[in-house]
Regions:
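Flexible coil/loop and intrinsically disordered segments
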Residues: 1-538
């Protein structure tokens, strides 16, 4: 209370304004008056506009966003009360005493010292209208929205678009960014149509509503809605095509800082070019990135930029999927009309991915004694009798020293001795090979999710292989070790590495990843990625 029957409204201004407009329409006079602290002195006050609402027109409503909504609400009320009987029923509700069926206003008076605390408590946890909510309401508004013949169809199409964008397969092809509070996936579509930049959207999630859809100076609502539908259908066509899906998804993953700008550019190209020209342009963009620092696949190594390596391995997986699809599609006996597999970009964005050494790196990276103990136990299981042979007296001696001291430097010496012996006995890829084909070469690297990679630390190849196969879904539930592992998505090429699918000779050994295995693996990369590095035709 401010005295003299004046009150400061903490919460409920919209409800009071709605009641005011109802009363003005039903009785033609003010039930109370408003004073606004933030009225612009350069335009008529909101209180004056409310007072004269019955005589205001659409032209004056366009001067101010508040005037527009007040005007719209008043005319919605007038349309609602076209039936005089309905108008009288509402008057009866207002005029009856409170002990009869009537409308009463309830309010709470708060001490001035507690007004800010009360406001916070009242609004805590409220769900505010999003940009999408506002645009949907604008389009479907009975008074000022789309023409009546379009509204019903628009409501159904709007719902279908929202549902399709909730499909993670579709969404992560075009955008891998995490949405902030108040942002929606439909906003992305509206931003594309409105020409909203990513930087503008990050600052104001309602930018496209304020600056385009609610701007009466721009095209009419029907034209704007048509642009939304056409843009969505073009995106959906890109998703439905196995080639554009994979190439756009790969480029989005590689450069996800500015998805609005990227998709805007690709949409423009898609409108201008034929389908085959568009696919060629996408592949050309990928080629430029892959060959920016490396002119050949064998120039890549563990020391290359990790972002570049991730794209290289991603494209190996993508081209493996696409070329397999082409082989099956060309076989008339199979009658394959649609794609049979799509790379799940949502998992690329949601999970963390490592560049993994197939044959473990010689350097020890164990952070605590528990990890070191677990690794030693796994080594004894994997090597079996080889570990306890008399010739391994040096290893036994180092193990005794470490078991007594538990010092990291003593473990590192033991670890190095074990790894060197393993490499020597199994033809595993060596460290510091004179021809440069060491453990840092591209043929000893693959893409693996961080969780699986770090779960087995620097395990030997046989154990890594078992981890990968079990994580990929082939497990024995009665086996304690295998049942403890969490199923994960294993990219096709990573799976083929650890199952040694690239080595088709009859000399195959499952005890280690050899240089021969690495050479066959790189050969497949060169074949699958030939267009990007050898200027082969598409």
């Amino acid at each position: 209370p401010l005295g003299d029957e004046r009150y400061s409204v903490i919460d409920g201004q919209q409800r009071l304004t709605t009641l005011y407009l109802l009363h003005m329409y039903l009785y033609g006079n003010e039930p109370y008056t408003f004073e606004y602290d933030r009225d612009d002195s350069n335009i008529p006050s909101r209180s004056e506009y409310l007072k004269n609402i019955a005589s205001e027109n659409e032209k004056t409503a366009d001067k101010n966003i508040d005037f527009f909504y007040i005007y719209t609400a008043y005319h919605y009320i007038s349309d609602f009360f076209l039936d005089d009987k309905l108008k009288q029923s509402f008057r009866d509700l207002l005029e009856r005493p409170k002990d009869q069926k009537s409308l009463q206003v309830i309010w709470y008076e708060v001490e001035r010292a507690r007004q800010y605390e009360t406001f916070r408590n009242l609004n805590s946890g409220k769900i505010h209208l999003t940009n999408t909510d506002l645009i949907k309401a604008l389009l479907l508004n009975r008074v000022s929205g789309l023409p009546q013949v379009e509204r019903m169809e628009a409501a159904a199409i709007f719902e279908r678009m929202e549902r399709d964008l909730q499909n993670d397969h579709f969404w992560y092809m075009i955008n891998g960014n995490e949405l902030r509070e108040g942002q929606t996936r439909m906003d992305f579509l509206f931003n594309l149509v409105a020409g909203c930049k990513q930087s503008d959207y990050d600052i104001d999630s309602r930018w496209s509503f304020r600056n385009y859809f609610n701007d009466s100076k721009k095209e009419n609502l029907s034209q704007k809605w048509k642009a939304v539908r056409h843009t969505f259908l073009r995106l959906k066509d890109m998703y439905d095509n196995i080639y554009s899906y994979h190439y756009i998804g790969g480029l989005t993953y590689n450069s996800n800082r500015n998805p609005i700008n990227n998709i805007t550019r690709w949409l423009a190209l898609n409108r201008e070019l034929t389908h085959s020209e568009f696919i060629n342009r996408l592949r050309s963009e990928i080629k430029t990135i892959l060959t920016r620092k490396h002119k050949a696949i064998t120039e890549y190594s563990y020391y290359s930029d990790k972002k570049d390596l991730r794209l290289l391995f991603l494209m190996h997986n993508i081209e493996t999927i696409l070329q397999r699809f082409e082989q099956l599609h060309e076989d008339e006996r199979l009658s394959l009309e649609n794609e049979y597999e799509k790379f799940p970009f949502e998992l690329l964005h949601r999970q963390s991915w490592d560049i993994e050494h197939i044959s473990s790196n010689t350097d020890s990276d164990f952070r605590n004694s528990a990890d070191r103990k677990a690794w030693l136990e796994s080594i004894k299981q994997d090597l079996g009798n080889e570990y306890t042979k008399d010739e391994n007296s040096k290893i036994k001696e180092l193990e005794m020293i470490y078991s007594t001291s538990e010092k990291r430097e003593d473990f590192n010496r033991l670890y190095t001795a074990i790894m060197r012996q393993y490499d020597d006995k199994t033809d595993s890829i060596k460290d510091n090979a004179p021809d440069g084909k060491d453990k840092m070469q591209i043929g000893n690297l693959t893409l693996l999710d961080s969780s699986t990679n770090r779960s087995y630390h620097n395990a030997l190849f046989p154990r890594k292989r078992r981890y990968i196969i079990v994580a990929d879904g082939i497990s024995d539930k009665s086996d304690k070790f295998e049942s403890s592992l969490t199923p994960r998505y294993i990219p096709p090429c990573t799976r083929q590495v650890f199952t040694k699918a690239y080595n088709k000779t009859n000399k195959l050994s499952l005890n280690a990843w050899t240089q021969e295995d690495a050479d066959f693996y790189v050969k497949d990369m060169e074949q699958k990625l030939g267009y990007y590095f050898n200027n082969e035709k598409i």
